[in-house]
Amino acid sequence: DRLIHLREVEKLNFSFIIQVDTLCHRLPNFIAKCARAGVKKVFIGLENINPDNLLAAKKRQNKITEYRTMLLAWQKAGVLTYAGYITGFPGDTAESIIRDVEIIKKELPIDVLEFFYLTPLPGSEDHQKMFRAGAWMDPDLNKYDLYHVTAGHPKMSREEWDFAYREAWRRYYSFEHCETIMRRAAALRAFGNTLFAVSWFKGCIEIEDVHPIEGGLLRIKDRLSRRPTMPMEPAWRFYPRYFAEVVSKTARWVWLYGRLRRIYLRIKHDPKRYEYTDLAITPVADDEAETHQMFQTDSGQAFLDRQRRLERARKDGGGDKPEPMVAAE
């Protein structure tokens, strides 16, 4: 309320990004107030759409039956949705990761999705367990950035996991799906920074080969900044190669942004842009969960069964007692 006062009464112009959990939309007026307070982007800890993987991540509060309702609530408030998705849970395979990405593209209206490797970060519980079990972990701490494979997987080889991870990025940020993202945003009147966001994420992966949270418009390299074990590259070789790299990447960035901007302008000037609809931006019906691909797995059906039992128990108990919630992680 104080932030709203500063913006609407004191006329201070500011905006920010917040991080929330997947049940924040249940808090009365929370999303509407966030939008008025200046929230332009919201990071949502989606983590996964597989119920077993969510339990492994200790995300019991994440209810996949409510993902779309929550995402639509943010988008209708004009806030760009930004979610993280972890690959490499024990039950994952290359095929299941790719399948889940295709389901997300079809059924969830996420603007920006970033992918991570499941990583045993030093100091975490996972790292401690793996260390005590004597499991292999990459000794190079520079790779613990969630963008490199740093541990083994029970069902995938390192090559399979890496392929699935790269394929997830490629499929989600295909030009076809980038257009779908922008069409959804236009239909919901939430265009905002969608063009910049999809350009940034697609370009960082395909041009710079760095995670978007570590990316930038110009990659600065210092010839003298080398690991002690690596030889120093001579100036006559380093600077011409660096210059050529900058020119090449800049040209690719310009081409990429230009192509996406043409898509953006075509949608923006389409008189029927507000009429666009698909499954992801269709309001959720009470009985539609069973028809979604998201639930056409053993774990998905088991999750639905548990939810039905809990709902019956609440009704039999004489009321709808809400589950404990927190508004931000």
Predicted regions and their residues:
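A structural motif corresponding to the C-terminal lobe/cap of the Radical SAM core domain
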Residues: 5-195, 215-218, 271-329
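Alpha-helical membrane-targeting segments
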Residues: 176-273, 278
